[in-house]
């Protein structure tokens, strides 16, 4: 028996009500977490499809089970669309997450204990770029590079000097909280100069790369990884790209049977439909609006001397704000904004002096509000509401004004049209 919504509600009211509350929360909140987005109904339909029933260890044409002709078609669609989007010769669409994709990439490029350079977490890197608490930092000898302490920009001369000193087998480029353009060609020059491989994690900027609004790493990286959500607006999952056939074989083996069993073909289907959406000309307009909205919000903060934007601005979908002149730390800011239905996250800033559980900064992203239809005017209004909240944290009347303004915005831009 396949449940419809009424069946589901009657059968498991507790779970139904929890999901309904989350739907209400998303509708009534302004979502600024840079790693979140709003998927289409088509993506949700594919992910909730009957494909969830099918086990399909292996790859199209090379499965361990029978009855896989249809899922082979589904997975091949996802692969071919990913290759078309990013101009790559090979694509693996099976990783369950970006972290799984990174793990498989490392397994394809280096050996345990090898020296690797990755971006410092506080400077904008990611846990899987060598943090001691991550499998990456525990399996490989990661050494972090940072940004210039004055400009807060990547310092390629310093990165080259460090690479010449430590002689890494692999350099990892890409970030989870860096608001400027990354020059991947320079990273490749450094890697070549020291005999290292280059891996790029473009999880945050993949949608901008797909739209031609950020330089692509694919021509320069030996392996490129990404998530399929964030700016790509797809389901939660991972993707690995390469132009090297030998590496493609290693990647496939690293994913299956290396670190995963059967792929989640319902998620692969959701990736496929989201990739079709990315190939639509309308996606480029969406991605351009994401950057416009990010810049519009950043400009409001730049005009207020009580706040400091890391690196002085943004050229992508996100930016970091040092809030310590106004509130105690980023965690306090995050909690205050939660109370007025604005959702974002505390975030470390370069050369952070506070713990990662408190932080000096907050991270603000424009992908989700742009998906709802917010424009530059609404984005500026959102930034003003953030500032108003943080500067009036003890004034309940002002906070209620902010809540009302948030409600007006979310009502004007529904999460999904009926």
Swiss-Prot record:
Coiled coil: none annotated. Its cofactor is pyridoxal 5'-phosphate. GO terms for cellular component: cytosol. Its EC number is 2.1.2.1. It is found in: Cytoplasm. GO terms for molecular function: glycine hydroxymethyltransferase activity; pyridoxal phosphate binding. This is Serine hydroxymethyltransferase. Belongs to the SHMT family. One of its GO terms (biological process) is tetrahydrofolate interconversion. The modification N6-(pyridoxal phosphate)lysine is found at residue 230. Keywords: Amino-acid biosynthesis, Cytoplasm, One-carbon metabolism, Pyridoxal phosphate, Transferase. It comes from the Bacteria. SUPFAM superfamilies: PLP-dependent transferases (SSF53383). Signal peptide: none annotated. Pathway: One-carbon metabolism; tetrahydrofolate interconversion; Amino-acid biosynthesis; glycine biosynthesis; glycine from L-serine: step 1/1.
